[in-house]
Amino acid sequence: MRTEYCGQLRLSHVGQQVTLCGWVNRRRDLGSLIFIDMRDREGIVQVFFDPDRADALKLASELRNEFCIQVTGTVRARDEKNINRDMATGEIEVLASSLTIINRADVLPLDSNHVNTEEARLKYRYLDLRRPEMAQRLKTRAKITSLVRRFMDDHGFLDIETPMLTKATPEGARDYLVPSRVHKGKFYALPQSPQLFKQLLMMSGFDRYYQIVKCFRDEDLRADRQPEFTQIDVETSFMTAPQVREVMEALVRHLWLEVKGVDLGDFPVMTFAEAERRYGSDKPDLRNPMELTDVADLLKSVEFAVFAGPANDPKGRVAALRVPGGASLTRKQIDEYGNFVKIYGAKGLAYIKVNERAKGLEGINSPVAKFLNAEIIEAILDRTAAQDGDMIFFGADNKKIVADAMGALRLKVGKDLGLTDESKWAPLWVIDFPMFEDDGEGGLTAMHHPFTSPKDMTAAELKAAPENAVANAYDMVINGYEVGGGSVRIHNGDMQQTVFGILGINEEEQREKFGFLLDALKYGTPPHAGLAFGLDRLTMLLTGTDNIRDVIAFPKTTAAACLMTEAPSFANPTALSELSIQVVKKAENN
């Protein structure tokens, strides 16, 4: 039906007869001439109808936005004065000789001249995807997956599929369950990741595996998460953590070079402890120049419990954040930041405005200055390298609250004051995470997953002091987003059972849930390590959007619903009966 795409016509096509298929993007009726911007997935070209082709001109008068049409015509060069430098096809136009209206369009529920609500865009997603910016994002996503496949193939990785219907295993979120009709009362689980299957593939001898795979997690959603998402899943045998990072870094550098024309350079490597100490986050945005500075040792003897308490508590922390030029902040802005940190558990926000350092106490403005002598204030200013016109904010509480609150404040202030250089790319690796974290109920939970190997510890040493264990794990972070994470896996049965025991999984439960894995570990398991990238998040960064739904063709809302198909929906009673399922409605409280 077509000979060319609209958006691919150039001066080299001048004089050629072409047939185009697409949609009316815009129509301009000048009476004796009608111009339309005709659109397909590759872009837009101007088509015009003149009186010499009366039948085509008459039919063109009926055209409206989003009519699906076919046009045959001749490509012509535009006059110099009519060239549109803002269009890829702006040097040419098509003189139409024939027009076919394939399908007419009703009045559109989306308005191309105004900003539509996201609810409307998701309900009429098939129309939203016609917009050039949305089409370009999905084309970029397709390019990324193609680049990934070629890179992985070139590096000896095998694309191997793993099951979608599998067994529920604890991986940090709730599973989506699928009832079995054949096995009454039993359920499959949709995979949160192919984690165990890819480890089993290593045990099977496939030493380099990858897969671009759908994963499912029934968890509370955020703007950058979806209940179903796509991973670039990778596993290797006989490779160390630095070797895995080297190959995966090369992949990401390749993507940025091919898609953005940007050389990311070598990625710096930072430990979890350093990232938390300097930035209050295990996924720091290094485009922001501000850092947290520990000042607890300067405040242990002050008669101000807000500072002295955490300063003398081994589990406490007092950190300062110097904001260049922050002395210009108004009282209202400071109060807003004080309320902001309370979201993260902080009780408030102390500060020092540095107006003129040379004047000592008279050169600062601070509600806490009365609790601090001149010597302590000067020491704080020296340590933070404060200059005239700066603001110093303080966080004082337990270590987690200080990191969470001050880390979030750092990001917000950096954006509000334009301190974060959003023109830059700032990738890094974060390594050496704690293996376990407090579950809030007196027990421990795996910080990554229970198949991650500890770093430089035997099973006996791990059992004796699990709180000291460092995971042989690594995350890739770009501009404050965790785009991928992985680890060296446990390849020894004793170590795996020790980790299960620390997590409160008894031997009976181990056999029930992971018997197949424990059995496989008995038969010459190779050392193995891997990583998974979030394809959606990578695409989000590479296309310059901050909404992950913009890079998924048919995404869910934050309530895990599809507004277009109205999924989820009630099931047919007959189907439920065949599955031995009965829906019980809870009585509403009066």
From Swiss-Prot:
Main location: cytoplasm
GO cellular component annotations of the record: cytoplasm
Keywords per UniProt: Aminoacyl-tRNA synthetase, ATP-binding, Cytoplasm, Ligase, Nucleotide-binding, Protein biosynthesis
GO biological process entries: aspartyl-tRNA aminoacylation
Residues at which ATP binds: 217-219, 226, 482, 534-537
GO molecular function: aspartate-tRNA ligase activity; ATP binding; nucleic acid binding
Xref: InterPro entries: Aa-tRNA-synt_II, aa-tRNA-synth_II, aa-tRNA-synth_II/BPL/LPL, Asp-tRNA-ligase_1, Asp-tRNA-ligase_1_N, Asp/Asn-tRNA-synth_IIb, AspRS_core, GAD-like_sf
Residues annotated as binding L-aspartate: 171, 217, 448, 489
Quaternary context: Homodimer.
Function: Catalyzes the attachment of L-aspartate to tRNA(Asp) in a two-step reaction: L-aspartate is first activated by ATP to form Asp-AMP and then transferred to the acceptor end of tRNA(Asp).
Protein name as catalogued: Aspartate--tRNA ligase
Organism: Escherichia fergusonii (strain ATCC 35469 / DSM 13698 / CCUG 18766 / IAM 14443 / JCM 21226 / LMG 7866 / NBRC 102419 / NCTC 12128 / CDC 0568-73)
